[in-house]
Amino acid sequence: MDLRNQYLVRSEPYYHAVGDEIERFEAAYANRIPMMLKGPTGCGKSRFVEYMAWKLGKPLITVACNEDMTAADLVGRFLLDKEGTRWQDGPLTTAARIGAICYLDEVVEARQDTTVVIHPLTDHRRILPLDKKGEVVEAHPDFQIVISYNPGYQSAMKDLKTSTKQRFAAMDFDYPAPEVESEIVAHESGVDAATAKKLVEVAIRSRHLKGHGLDEGISTRLLVYAGSLITKGIAPLIACEMALICPITDDPDLRYALRAAAQTLFA
């Protein structure tokens, strides 16, 4: 299979637009402007990027960033095999060569000295120097970089350099309005509308606890997990315990408060 076709999104991902984010992204892509998506965990940033890659008909290469990731993990390295030494492109280099959308998920998890390798690709130059190989890759006309992160987890140690931020246009994401979120949960998990609405209400109550013991409220993703368990015959209160309460806190008092909310709604 052609390398470009290998990374195409084959079927339409489900994405419920909550505003004009699709039109904004299309305008940015038309001008090959690098994009920064900011929002809480599980609010739909990654699904949005996947949907836009499908809609634009472009390959998508996703990199889950982490603190152990090095610049070589992005651009590539020399490898030894039985025939000798060969160069292996990293995901960023592959995306630049084939004209893919390169999505760096949770980019602030990577070290700052790693993320600076994207700088030449995010200005007028649109090049990627491969110093170890002595090559300069000129980005394919279709290439675009998209990064995402959760601003709620920012700290002095985990933030983007100003010189990096100012190379991107940005869009803020948040959890959808309750009626929209209920529709998403019902569609993705298969639960009925009434159950989806109750699950969303549990999540809303948890989000009110952000900064009061919880770093983050219950995400839309976790609501889909809970709904999926319910459709497989798990009792709603047990599904809430498994998918909504246990994953986000170990604090007994917070768990008690969330259980009480679930019991009120599903009694």
UniProtKB/Swiss-Prot annotation:
Molecular function, one GO term: ATP binding
Span of the signal peptide: none
Keywords of this entry: ATP-binding, Nucleotide-binding
Residue numbers binding ATP: 39-46, 99-106
One Pfam family named in its UniProt record: CbbQ_C
InterPro entries: ATPase_dyneun-rel_AAA, CbbQ/NirQ/NorQ/GpvN, CbbQ_C, P-loop_NTPase
Family to which this protein belongs: Belongs to the CbbQ/NirQ/NorQ/GpvN family.
Described purpose of this protein according to its UniProt entry: May affect the post-translational activation and/or assembly of the oligomeric structure of RuBisCO.
PANTHER family: DENITRIFICATION REGULATORY PROTEIN NIRQ, MOXR FAMILY PROTEIN
Name of this protein: Protein CbbQ
